[in-house]
């Protein structure tokens, strides 16, 4: 399916994290938003600026809580398949695909890439299940990439969200 982007948001930032005490700081170096300037569209897409944390048990997407594929209860909601092993950015990783155990649950389909030595999450790509029933959304894809910044510390370095919106032909009422 071909897509023409009509709204793109990009930013480059430096992110600082301190484990003890737990503090985070982000300095945005540059930001650019390109595309349509329609108020109702901007309100709808405003939720796209939410922070998606794959390590949380629940991931909030457009007002609905999805079970993370790496949540504490992931084995109750997902089936996992070891699919491949490959190099990603000089890291040997295992590709593990996941699918929902049952239809109708707020879950994802997708893949995890796990570092073979540290078992850290290198990359995740997830798609909403077609039964999620989110208004105006046909398809949603979340991709996150993590890089090792210290021997035991991996950090989110790339965060992508792709949303395929479906507009109603006629107004409501």
Locations of the language-model features?
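Structured extracytoplasmic
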Residues: 1-95, 99-107, 168-173
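Gly/Pro-enriched, hydrophobic low-complexity segments
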Residues: 67-69, 81-82, 91-173
């Amino acid at each position: 399916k071909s897509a023409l982007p009509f709204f793109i948001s990009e930013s480059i930032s430096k992110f600082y994290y301190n484990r003890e005490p737990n503090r985070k700081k982000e300095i945005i170096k540059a930001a650019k938003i390109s595309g349509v300037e329609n108020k109702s569209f901007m309100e709808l897409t405003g939720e796209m600026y939410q922070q998606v944390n794959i390590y949380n048990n629940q991931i909030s997407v457009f007002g609905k809580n999805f079970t993370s594929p790496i949540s504490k209860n992931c084995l109750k909601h997902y089936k996992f398949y070891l699919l491949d092993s490959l190099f990603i950015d000089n890291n040997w990783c295992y590709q593990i695909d996941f699918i929902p155990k049952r239809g109708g649950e707020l879950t994802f389909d997708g893949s995890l890439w796990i570092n073979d030595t540290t078992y850290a999450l290198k990359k995740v790509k997830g798609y909403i299940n077609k039964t999620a029933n989110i208004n105006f959304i046909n398809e949603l894809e979340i991709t996150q990439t993590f890089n090792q910044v210290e021997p035991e510390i991996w950090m989110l370095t790339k965060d992508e969200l792709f949303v395929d919106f479906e507009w109603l032909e006629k107004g409501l009422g």
